[in-house]
C-alpha cells in the first residue's frame, strides 16, 4: 500500500502546481515503471485529497456535502491550493483507470490539533490586526489529526476501498461561533468583528470590482464565488467512512481541549 499525503499548502500558484501535481505525476510514473516486477497486481494507492475539490458555491445553504457532491467545475475561480488538489485527484484517477494503481481517496475537512494553526478560513480571516469572523453559525468540517490519521490508515487496510472516495470529518461538529468563543475563553481574548454573510457578499462584490479596476494590483482576497464556497454554510457526512469501520478515537470536545491547551502554551 502506498500512502500519498504530500502537497503544497501554500505559496505561488506555480510552486503549488509543481509540488502537488507534478510530484504526484512523477510518483505515479515511477509506479508504472515497476509494474513488470510486481506482476499484474497494481498497488493500493491512498491519496489524501481535500474538501477543497468540491464545488459547493452554487448549492443551497445547508446542503449536506457527501461523496456524491459534484467536484468543482470552475477551478479558476478558486484558490491555488484547491485548484492543485483538484488536478492532483483527477490525475490519480487517470492512473487508476489505466490499471497502474488502485486508488482510494480520503477527503479530509479541516484537520486540526496541537502544532496546527489556530483558525481555518472557514472561521474567519485576520486582516489589519483585527480578526474578521465570517463563519457565523456555519458547521465546521473538523477532523482531529489522530482521527484523520486513523481514517487514512484504515483505507490502506481495506481492499474494498479501491475505486472509492471517503469524506473524513468527525462527529459532534461545532460551528464557527462556538469555535471562536471557546478560543477566546481558553487561549486569548482575541479582538474580532463579526460580519454577517450578506455583508461579506457585498464586500466581496466591491473587492472584485476594485480588483478588476486596479488590473490586479488589489488582491482579490474576497470574491463572491470564494465567499459562497467558504461561508455560505454546509453540513457534512461521514457515514460512508463509518460503514467500513472507522470511528473517531478522539471526541471533538477532547480534540478542542487539547488544541486550545497547546495554542495557549504556544502563545505564552
Predicted regions and their residues:
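Mid/C-terminal beta-alpha module of Rossmann-like enzyme folds, strongest
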Residues: 154-221, 257-260, 266-268
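Catalytic helix-loop patch of NAD(P)-dependent Rossmann-fold dehydrogenases
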Residues: 58-111, 132-134
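NAD(P)-dependent short-chain dehydrogenase/reductase
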Residues: 96-147, 154, 183
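Conserved Rossmann-fold NAD(P)-dependent oxidoreductase catalytic core, especially the SDR/UDP-sugar
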Residues: 26-80
